[in-house]
């Protein structure tokens, strides 16, 4: 009979618990900052996101144009780099932030957080569920926030150790290279299907929009553009493949830096009992890590 193992949760010695009064005051301060930011939104912000959108469109067009001359190695390298840059920008600085509703106030359909569809095999609806709701509501709560290792990686000592994790340095490499595919199937909860906690019929129903999006993305990058490239079909195909790989490596790296560094904390489900807004704010801080770099770095990382 397996005895339950008591988990000791790491508490960063740099942090201290706040009193209820301090938490209430803390929440009011952050709410005030939020309101000040909302009140300050205006034309400069609209111009910024439109410039980002234009940069993505132009870099994608130029990258694909260069790949049409991809038999010439410098053209292939430049085209692949531009296309990879475009995909990174679209996912990180445009798609991620737009889907958080940051630009809903513009009332521009292109930047509507509920309808925006991004350039990756995963559906935006699934991302809004797994990331916007589940991850940001239950940040770093063990057993709820799937971002803690995505069910594949052991990132904290609070996670139960299994012998298979010895292979983690090996299988994390293909996971990194194929990261968009992991994001695409995250909300399908395949593990629950295998353990009979979700019916096959429910799984197949949820799989339909995923398959549709995957088919659309594969057709665009690996059928349509290679076909219209004619003699340059092969360099266009490989350029798209490498550009997607570059995007996967970058997004994997940035996302794993955000919540899984040595000072970040993991929390038990019990913290949700009577959790106030101040507690929630504090959990976001204690479970997250800062990223610092150049302005270009912050743009490419979506200002996380």
State each model region's role.
Residues 243-249, 255-278:
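Active/binding-pocket-proximal capping segment
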Residues 26, 30-37, 52, 174, ...:
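Generic structural signal of hydrophobic/aromatic residues within well-ordered alpha-helices
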Residues 46-91, 166-181, 206-253:
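Alpha-helical bilayer-embedded segments of polytopic membrane proteins, i.e.
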Residues 95, 99-100, 229, 251, ...:
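Membrane-water interface at transmembrane helix exits
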Residues 13, 17-24, 118, 122, ...:
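Generic amphipathic alpha-helical segments used as scaffolds and interaction surfaces in large
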Residues 2-62:
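Low-complexity, highly charged intrinsically disordered N-terminal segments
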Residues 85-204, 272-304:
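Membrane-embedded catalytic scaffold of the fatty acid hydroxylase/desaturase
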């Amino acid at each position: 009979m397996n005895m339950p193992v008591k988990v000791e949760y790491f508490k960063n010695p740099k942090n201290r618990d706040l009193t209820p009064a301090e938490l209430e005051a803390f929440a009011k301060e952050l709410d005030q900052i939020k309101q000040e930011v909302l009140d300050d939104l205006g034309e400069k912000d609209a111009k910024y996101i439109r410039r980002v959108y234009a940069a993505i469109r132009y870099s994608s067009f130029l990258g694909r144009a260069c790949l049409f001359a991809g038999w010439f190695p410098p053209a292939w390298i430049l085209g692949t780099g531009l296309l990879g840059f475009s995909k990174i920008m679209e996912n990180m600085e445009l798609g991620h932030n737009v889907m958080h509703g940051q630009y809903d106030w513009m009332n521009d359909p292109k930047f509507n957080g509920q309808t925006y569809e991004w350039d990756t095999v995963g559906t935006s609806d699934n991302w809004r569920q797994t990331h916007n709701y589940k991850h940001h509501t239950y940040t770093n709560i063990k057993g709820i926030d799937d971002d803690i290792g995505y069910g594949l990686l052991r990132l904290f000592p609070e996670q139960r150790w299994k012998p298979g994790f010895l292979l983690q340095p090996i299988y994390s490499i293909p996971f990194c290279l194929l990261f968009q595919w992991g994001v695409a199937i995250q909300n399908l909860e395949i593990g629950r299907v295998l353990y009979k906690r979700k019916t096959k019929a429910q799984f197949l129903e949820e799989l339909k929009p995923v398959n549709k999006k995957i088919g659309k993305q594969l057709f665009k990058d690996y059928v349509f553009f290679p076909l219209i490239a004619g003699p340059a079909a092969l360099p266009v195909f490989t350029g798209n493949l490498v550009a997607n790989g570059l995007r996967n490596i970058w997004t994997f790296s940035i996302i794993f830096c955000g919540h899984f560094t040595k000072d970040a904390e993991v929390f038990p489900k019990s913290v949700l009992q009577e959790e106030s807004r101040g507690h929630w704010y504090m959990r976001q801080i204690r479970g997250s890590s800062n990223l610092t770099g150049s302005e270009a770095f912050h743009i490419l990382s979506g200002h996380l």
